[in-house]
């Protein structure tokens, strides 16, 4: 039993895994993580609509053939099929088939505003894990959220370019360099997805590192960001598999059912993101507590 309560892992700063899990369970039981996840998912859900409008209104200005089909194909790989067919594609078709003057600038402003609001909501959730409330004033919070939003947008566009243009580049490289080996092409594709995974990891690490208004920061490369990266991918795969089996649910509720499923998918990812942050917060909390107890023991000894 003693070994169980003292066992630790790399990246835990010698904090026992038992103490970390105990802290996480207590936070979930208090309903703090689920409540914050609902708030974050709702904020980003509102930002999704103008984001889609902005992205697909921008497509005609990009001189690449088959760009729309490639983008829909990528969305289809990430999100459950039922959501894509009844919800995403419906929105995309409406944007492309009914062009509206001035929509690009309006959609970009709305996307920026609501995305920034989502980051504000996320930072607020992070601060509650530290028991820190509103240490930054309104303008400081907005400015930080805007900077993080713009950085995340650049990382997102980079990932999107790698996904969409990657196949085209690989095809041309294969022709120019006379690459015929399927293993070589597979390795190049694997490298491309590893870079995208790295960009996703960096995005989460940026939020964990710069988001909380704490004097002492987490490590940029942390256990929590690793858990959130792989956890969200695994959760999305499980959720996609589960939703794909609910054909009756989709046929009954149709478009509104797709909205509910999309919100649920965003909630699951927000929940995993907060669990990753709570893991870092638990290590931080228990490490400080351990140091305090050691200091008190040394004072008593003296």
Predicted features, each with a name:
Residues 2-302:
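Membrane-embedded alpha-helices and immediately adjacent juxtamembrane helical segments
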């Amino acid at each position: 039993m003693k070994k169980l309560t003292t066992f630790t892992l790399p990246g835990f700063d010698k904090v026992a895994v038992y103490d970390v899990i105990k802290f996480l369970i207590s936070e979930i039981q208090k309903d703090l993580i689920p409540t914050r996840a609902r708030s974050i998912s709702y904020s980003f859900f509102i930002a999704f609509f103008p984001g889609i409008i902005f992205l697909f209104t921008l497509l005609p200005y990009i001189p690449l053939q088959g760009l729309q089909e490639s983008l829909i194909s990528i969305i289809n790989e990430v999100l459950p099929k039922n959501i894509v067919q009844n919800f995403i594609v419906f929105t995309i078709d409406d944007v492309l088939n009914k062009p509206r003057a001035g929509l690009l600038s309006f959609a970009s402003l709305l996307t920026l505003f609501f995305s920034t609001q989502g980051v504000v909501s996320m930072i607020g959730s992070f601060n509650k894990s530290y028991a820190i409330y509103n240490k930054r004033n309104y303008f400081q919070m907005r400015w930080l959220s805007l900077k993080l939003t713009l950085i995340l947008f650049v990382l997102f566009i980079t990932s999107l370019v790698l996904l969409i243009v990657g196949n085209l580049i690989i095809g041309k490289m294969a022709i120019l360099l006379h690459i015929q080996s399927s293993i070589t092409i597979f390795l190049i594709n694997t490298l491309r997805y590893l870079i995208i995974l790295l960009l996703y990891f960096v995005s989460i690490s940026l939020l964990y590192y710069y988001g909380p208004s704490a004097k002492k920061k987490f490590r940029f490369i942390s256990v929590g960001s690793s858990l959130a990266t792989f956890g969200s991918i695994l959760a999305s795969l499980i959720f996609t598999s589960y939703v794909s089996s609910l054909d009756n649910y989709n046929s009954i509720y149709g478009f509104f059912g797709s909205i509910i499923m999309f919100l649920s998918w965003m909630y699951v990812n927000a929940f995993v993101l907060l669990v990753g942050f709570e893991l870092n917060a638990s290590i931080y909390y228990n490490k400080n507590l351990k140091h305090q107890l050691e200091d008190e023991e040394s004072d008593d000894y003296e």
